[in-house]
């Protein structure tokens, strides 16, 4: 494990070899890249960096499904990805980015050839990230396809983070959040080493922040206890950047979407976590020191933002 930590640290720290000020980045991902769309553009702008960012998104999409979608892309009508875009280099409506999603959706080969991307990112679905056997052979196949269709692009891997303690999958896997991190960290490191790819270490930054704040869960409520909560009572996440709880109706995919109830999301970053993710991405992509960033969203207090920026930089530098 120690050798893996050193290897991943080197993969992360090497991003400072070259500093860029303008990049076109395509993310082949899911909701864990959708969250990168929230604050990364604003952090990049504050750091004087020009970032054109596009996200091919299917919620919860694993590498296996991404590759299956590539194999189906011979049918030009097969456009399974919604596309989120942040385009700063020119008017989005006049830019080549519109080629990515002429009908509002896209497939991977089409998107890869629509622009001269500087960087293309991949990642495993969070629910499979701790188990390297789920990566293959799909990661190898996807990497080969990216190299074929976008040979000018550097491929990077976003290391997705471990869940907050309330996620029931941790119980199924018999893992704590820290143990989930250790396993996914090793899995991503194995893939990076195999293909000599750099890592965007979002997971490490989340761990750094949890340690440095620190985040200590004083009470984990049982399902029975949570069922007894009354609006507006919600469980505490103790400052964690992952996880949130609220009262309201569900999302479109929830069977009880029309029911007003306590909703919990222990796997995605909350708004504060999205700022941390943005700092990691900008530091990693552009090789800049985000501890000097003067931007923070209004909902993140300055003292908390300082901890986040330091956690992000330490992760990217491999410290």
Language model features: what each stretch is:
Residues 1-4:
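Positively charged n-region of N-terminal signal peptides that target proteins for export
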Residues 9-17:
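Hydrophobic h-region of N-terminal signal peptides that target proteins for export
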Residues 22-24, 52:
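Residues that mark the start of a beta-strand
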Residues 104-271, 283:
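Alpha-helical cap/lid subdomain in secreted, periplasmic
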């Amino acid at each position: 494990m120690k050798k893996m930590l050193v290897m991943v640290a080197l993969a992360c720290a090497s991003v400072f070899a070259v500093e860029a000020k303008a990049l076109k980045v395509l993310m082949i991902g899911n909701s864990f890249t959708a969250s990168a769309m929230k604050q990364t553009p604003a952090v990049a702008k504050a750091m004087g960096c020009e970032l054109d960012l596009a996200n091919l998104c299917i919620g919860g999409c694993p590498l296996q499904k991404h590759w299956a979608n590539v194999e189906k892309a011979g049918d030009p009508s097969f456009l399974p990805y919604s596309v989120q875009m942040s385009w700063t280099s020119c008017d989005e409506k006049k830019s080549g980015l519109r080629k990515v999603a002429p009908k509002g959706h896209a497939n991977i080969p089409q998107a890869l050839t629509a622009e001269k991307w500087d960087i293309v990112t991949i990642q495993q679905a969070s629910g499979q990230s701790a188990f390297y056997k789920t990566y293959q052979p799909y990661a190898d196949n996807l990497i080969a396809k990216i190299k074929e269709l976008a040979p000018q692009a550097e491929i990077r891997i976003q290391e997705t983070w471990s869940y907050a303690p309330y996620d029931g999958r941790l119980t199924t896997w018999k893992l704590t959040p820290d143990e989930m991190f250790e396993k996914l960290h090793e899995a991503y490191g194995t893939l990076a080493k195999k293909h000599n790819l750099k890592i965007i270490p979002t997971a490490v930054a989340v761990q750094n922040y949890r340690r440095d704040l620190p985040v200590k869960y004083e009470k984990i409520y049982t399902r029975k206890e949570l069922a007894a909560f009354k609006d507006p009572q919600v469980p505490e996440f103790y400052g964690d950047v992952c996880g949130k709880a609220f009262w309201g109706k569900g999302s479109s995919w929830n069977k009880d979407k029309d029911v007003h109830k306590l909703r919990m999301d222990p796997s995605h970053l909350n708004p504060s976590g999205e700022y941390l993710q943005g700092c990691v991405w900008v530091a990693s992509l552009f090789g800049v020191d985000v501890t000097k960033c003067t931007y923070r969203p209004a909902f993140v207090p300055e003292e908390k933002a300082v901890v986040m920026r330091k956690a992000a930089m330490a992760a990217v530098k491999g410290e």
